[in-house]
Amino acid sequence: MPIEIVCKIKFAEEDAKPKEKEAGDEQSLLGAVAPGAAPRDLATFASTSTLHGLGRACGPGPHGLRRTLWALALLTSLAAFLYQAAGLARGYLTRPHLVAMDPAAPAPVAGFPAVTLCNINRFRHSALSDADIFHLANLTGLPPKDRDGHRAAGLRYPEPDMVDILNRTGHQLADMLKSCNFSGHHCSASNFSVVYTRYGKCYTFNADPRSSLPSRAGGMGSGLEIMLDIQQEEYLPIWRETNETSFEAGIRVQIHSQEEPPYIHQLGFGVSPGFQTFVSCQEQRLTYLPQPWGNCRAESELREPELQGYSAYSVSACRLRCEKEAVLQRCHCRMVHMPGNETICPPNIYIECADHTLDSLGGGPEGPCFCPTPCNLTRYGKEISMVRIPNRGSARYLARKYNRNETYIRENFLVLDVFFEALTSEAMEQRAAYGLSALLGDLGGQMGLFIGASILTLLEILDYIYEVSWDRLKRVWRRPKTPLRTSTGGISTLGLQELKEQSPCPSRGRVEGGGVSSLLPNHHHPHGPPGGLFEDFAC
């Protein structure tokens, strides 16, 4: 029967001390190589932190009233800083801006703006044919009758051409323009370009941006001065009211840049007959801020469809393009004044579909035709004044000159004088009132005032948090190792087979039966080499 003998081996104290010393030296060496391997505690960190008051509130030392007061002071200062920081952040997120005005130095030459004018009456009564009256009945309110005064119910007219009707029946500038001068030089109807608006056939002076006329001086006599006959005898009689019925007499005028199409039915101003109207202009160059400070449209954000038919983006061009898309989608045609090559709407579609579509469109931020302002814009500020004309002497003179009576002169003649107040332009620029650099500066001032901190202090706190977190993760990831032997003090318990395998000495006998004489206590054999090493076997 096999016998298992368990022995206890006790090493001499002289053998253990050098090993402990060696292990201690190795541990000291590792500690010198990798200092701070274990994270610092909060008290140690607080005593070395540059955050004011943290060392006195959380540092090493006894807990007492003094430390409590310091902790309250630290928390109060921290709360005050957070309150101020929240207010600064809210102010920054509102994106405030201011407007700076910089008057420019006088220039020797200034580009004269484009001047668009329209007679308020769209169709001349004498120029309307029977077919025109028939097709325009819904627009003009005139009853469709033939030349004998009978209703033209059974007549068949050719399909109307709205462009031809407007071009043929609109007021002709050659008949209205009685005199024209620009900067002391004579001008004529040939210096005007035909343009179509909601008022029909209109005319624009100085329309071409490639050959813009210059103005070399400010004040009256250095701009455009024209005398017009509005031809009130050609105004349509009112039989019934329609959307196109007008009770006014005079012209509509808009002063704009050459890159901007006229939007005269909303942006124009009226000029009455019997008056000389003075319009003093001031060029204004406006610069708006894009998102998030404003809502202007930058040139880099423009898309090709938004510029279709125009050389540059403008609010007027955007509105006209949007209105055309709406009318085209609902009425399957476009109005004469809209850009594009699509089919022109006939007169009956004007009143039945197109006008209602335009009336339903809104231009507000929530409307389908909201057009943001371009970030760079040139506009012209206006100051308007007027005097009554003609006086008694000039009324008789003009009546003889144009073969009219004085009453006709007073009711139909007007003078328009457009000029620069001075050859200077105003630069108005939106600027961010509170930017990121100002926010950081204010936050730094509040941090220094309340808690005495800086960016480096925040880095210290983040570094300590990282150090503690990393140590916790290492402890979680570390797996415990199962030891091969269980040691208590200097005593180890081994089985006989382990003793045979781990002993550096060869076996001297067999463990069978009673053959155990070779396993004797150490003092029964000759002592080992000198040096104080003793091995005691307890079996």
Swiss-Prot record:
Expressed in pituitary gland. Weakly expressed in brain, vestibular system and organ of Corti. Disulfide bonds join 118-202, 180-187, 296-375, 318-371, 322-369, 331-353, 333-345. Pfam families: ASC. Its main location: membrane. Residues 1-68, 460-539 are cytoplasmic. PROSITE patterns: ASC. The chain crosses the membrane at residues 69-89, 439-459. Keywords: Cell membrane, Disulfide bond, Glycoprotein, Ion channel, Ion transport, Membrane, Sodium, Sodium channel, Sodium transport, Transmembrane, Transmembrane helix, Transport. GO terms for biological process: behavioral fear response; sodium ion transmembrane transport. One of its GO terms (cellular component) is plasma membrane. Does not exhibit measurable stand-alone pH-gated sodium channel activity but may form pH-gated heterotrimeric sodium channels. Its activity could also depend on alternative gating mechanisms. This is Acid-sensing ion channel 4. It comes from Homo sapiens (Human). The gene is ASIC4.
